[in-house]
């Protein structure tokens, strides 16, 4: 059984009125035996849209079948805001996932990121810029809450 939890990634909608959010697909099971890795999925869409179904939900189900809890990020796209808004939204997905790690039976030290196309660009960006003071505050960097433990890129725009 899979439970789904949705969370807003920002307090306010973007410039187009879209509210960036994440959908956590959490596998059921014995919490004492089934602590799982997780993967934060950044679907592609050329920063024009987010291909939530093809590169988000379907990929989440494939990872779930392999024993991962999966988090799909629906980030700001064209006209909704400028960089680094999108990378900060992905970072927030990592923070929320780590905040709920115990409740969702996630190993907080085994949270990966994956992305394809524009989502691959975001996955590569959070993987290399999570400790960049031009993007994040010193406090955010020191907490290491948004640092991916592994990265999977599928035809990234880099």
For each feature predicted by the language model, list its residue ranges:
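A domain-start/cap signature at the N-terminus of enzymes
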Residues: 1-25, 30-35, 158
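Short beta-strand element of the alpha/beta-hydrolase
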Residues: 35-44
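Short beta-to-alpha linker loops that shape the active-site pocket of alpha/beta-hydrolase fold enzymes
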Residues: 45, 69, 74-78, 157
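Primarily recognizes the serine-hydrolase "nucleophile elbow" in alpha/beta-hydrolase
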Residues: 92-158
């Amino acid at each position: 059984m899979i439970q789904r939890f949705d969370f807003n990634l920002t307090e306010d909608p973007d410039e187009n009125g879209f509210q960036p959010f994440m959908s956590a697909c959490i596998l059921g099971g014995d919490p004492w035996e089934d602590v799982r890795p997780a993967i934060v999925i950044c679907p592609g869409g050329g920063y024009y849209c987010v291909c939530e179904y093809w590169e988000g939900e379907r990929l989440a189900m494939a990872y779930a079948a392999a024993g991962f809890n999966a988090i799909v990020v629906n980030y700001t796209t064209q006209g909704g805001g400028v960089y680094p808004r999108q990378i900060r939204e992905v970072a927030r997905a990592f923070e929320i996932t780590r905040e709920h790690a115990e409740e969702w039976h996630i190993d907080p030290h085994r949270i990966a990121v994956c992305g394809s196309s524009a989502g691959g660009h975001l996955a590569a960006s959070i993987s290399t810029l999570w400790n960049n003071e031009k993007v994040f505050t010193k406090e955010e960097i020191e907490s290491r809450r948004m640092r991916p433990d592994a990265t999977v890129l599928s035809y990234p725009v880099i």
